[in-house]
């Protein structure tokens, strides 16, 4: 997986075992993080699981696969899955596949200092770092959300306090830290009270397919993107839908930037399998409970000639990652007209890819995000039709 995002003033790209920090203007690399092939060499340890009494594992000497991966007894390839900053930009969190772990770094201008490394039982799908020194790390896996509640002094075990029956794609924490907002493959957005997470505050219901992304707009409003080809704005405190905007294709990634004046936003959406790869929308709040899309810009990004998987948005450019001939590729487009960006330093792409030491790259198959639907009614009607015809033939015979 290749991850890319823009955090003023840095463009951050993670792939394989490296994270590169670039100046988006001249695309020069000024900092990098490289993980070792074996994370146990930088301190990855595991805690032996304590099975329930009478459980078969309590007497078994066989090591779980996840434990073997972390301890290194089974050789697995380490690759970066996600990279994210804390709000104050002082902490950087990486999650990995292969040897599943979360690494927490102190971000400094010249380099990054590793503070802690912890194993994960499952691969992380959408990590978030919250307020520094307080409940900072979230790790979203298929059916749980885990919090590690200290930065420098980790708790012996993470705390799992929310349950999901399908893959969680995004998470938000309200500004007052009273609500946790999550979305998943099962069409719904859930608003959970915190710290009483057993109590569901509200649901935002209406999507017909997976909800791929969330973003906070105001203290009470969020925006969501979905595979059902819609953008929707919600008052999440009561679960009320305020805006439904039809998209030309399913949305698999969403980025939101606040513009001037206040209550005006730029929303960028990556489409699934569409002639125009990215849509850029201007979203404005007209009244307290009213929102509207006032402009639309579609970016072709040469869709169809390569397999686009992710993108980052700056003031005037869109940085797009994808695969071409099974190799990682980066391209830059002008967000105002959708054309290839001009004025880029010669050889910047080769420089970035050489530093990433890119091997064969295959993006995630996003078709598995969609629900499989079975048409049992048509089969039933066909069988009924044949049965009626057979009965008629028997009567005539």
Curated annotation (Swiss-Prot):
InterPro entries per the UniProt record, alphabetical: Trm82, WD40/YVTN_repeat-like_dom_sf, WD40_repeat_dom_sf, WD40_rpt
Name recorded for this polypeptide: tRNA (guanine-N(7)-)-methyltransferase non-catalytic subunit wuho
Tissues expressed in: In testis, it is present at high level in hub cells, a niche for germline stem cells of testis. Ubiquitously expressed in all testicular cells throughout spermatogenesis. Ubiquitously expressed in all germline and somatic cells of the ovary.
Subunit and interaction comment: Forms a heterodimer with the catalytic subunit Mettl1. Interacts with mei-P26 and weakly interacts with bgcn; required for the function or formation of the mei-P26-bgcn-bam-sxl complex. Interacts with nanos; may be involved in mei-P26-dependent derepression of the BMP signaling pathway. Interacts with Myc; the interaction may be mediated by mei-P26 and may be involved in the regulation of ribosome biogenesis.
Further remark: Wuho means 'no progeny' in Chinese.
Compartments where located: Nucleus; Cytoplasm
Domain of life: Eukaryota
Family: Belongs to the WD repeat TRM82 family.
UniProt pathway annotation: tRNA modification; N(7)-methylguanine-tRNA biosynthesis
Keyword Cytoplasm: yes
One record GO biological process: oogenesis
Species lineage: Eukaryota, Metazoa, Ecdysozoa, Arthropoda, Hexapoda
Annotated keywords: Cytoplasm, Developmental protein, Differentiation, Nucleus, Oogenesis, Repeat, Spermatogenesis, tRNA processing, WD repeat
Pfam families, per the entry: WD40 (PF00400)
UniProt keyword annotation of Repeat present: yes
PROSITE patterns: WD_REPEATS_2, WD_REPEATS_REGION
Repeat positions for WD: 75-115, 163-202, 206-244, 303-343
GO CC entries: cytosol; female germ cell nucleus; male germ cell nucleus; nucleus; tRNA methyltransferase complex
Cross-referenced SUPFAM superfamilies: WD40 repeat-like
Role noted for this protein: Required for the Mettl1-dependent formation of N(7)-methylguanine at position 46 (m7G46) in tRNA. In the Mettl1-wuho methyltransferase complex, it is required to stabilize and induce conformational changes of the catalytic subunit. Required for binding of nanos mRNA and repression of translation by the mei-P26-bgcn-bam-sxl complex. May cooperate with mei-P26 and nanos to derepress the BMP signaling pathway. May cooperate with mei-P26 to suppress expression of a subset of microRNAs. May cooperate with mei-P26 to regulate bam expression levels in germline cells during gametogenesis.
